[in-house]
């Protein structure tokens, strides 16, 4: 197993490390203590990432991402953690919803959501936890049935992380 980094990965690591050193001090530290108060702070950080080209690292450039490989994306995470960067607020949007919309969504859905996910304007959550399921997705019972004017949702959820902040 080879543990040395390629010159491309090492260069990306140095770039991220420099960016973190130059930009993290610009955030209004300390991070606010309660979740609702964190929203402007998180959005500011996400906006900084977007403007610097560090949002949607593995997304296709067609959809506003950088189109880089998973190795360099993991280097970004390593360097962000080492630098004490705040956690990303919109991981569900950026890591799950956005790529799904990019792959399967209509052009209208892509236009409406992808950029707003990357900039942090819209926060996404996932509703998996149910009384009899936990996170066992195969046993979920909640259903969405198409009806005139939208969908009828039947089922029950226990909790959802950051739901109170989510647009979707």
Show where each model-derived region lies.
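Internal helix-loop-helix
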Residues: 46, 50-121, 161-168
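Buried hydrophobic positions in well-ordered alpha/beta secondary-structure cores of metabolic enzymes
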Residues: 9, 20, 53, 60, ...
């Amino acid at each position: 197993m080879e543990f040395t980094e390629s010159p491309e990965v090492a260069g990306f690591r140095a770039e991220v490390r420099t960016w973190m050193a130059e930009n993290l001090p610009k955030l209004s530290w300390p991070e606010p203590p309660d979740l609702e108060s964190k929203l402007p702070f998180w959005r500011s950080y996400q906006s900084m990432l977007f403007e610097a080209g560090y949002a949607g690292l593995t997304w296709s450039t067609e959809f506003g991402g950088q189109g880089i490989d998973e190795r360099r994306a993991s280097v970004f995470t390593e360097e962000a953690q080492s630098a004490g960067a705040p956690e990303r607020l919109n991981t569900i949007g950026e890591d799950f919803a956005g790529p799904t919309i990019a792959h399967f969504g209509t052009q209208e859905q892509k236009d409406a959501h992808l950029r707003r996910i990357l900039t942090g304007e819209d926060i996404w959550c996932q509703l998996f936890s149910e009384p009899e399921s936990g996170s066992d997705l195969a046993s979920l019972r909640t259903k969405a049935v198409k009806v005139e004017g939208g969908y009828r949702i039947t089922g029950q959820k226990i909790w959802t992380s950051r739901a109170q902040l989510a647009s979707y």
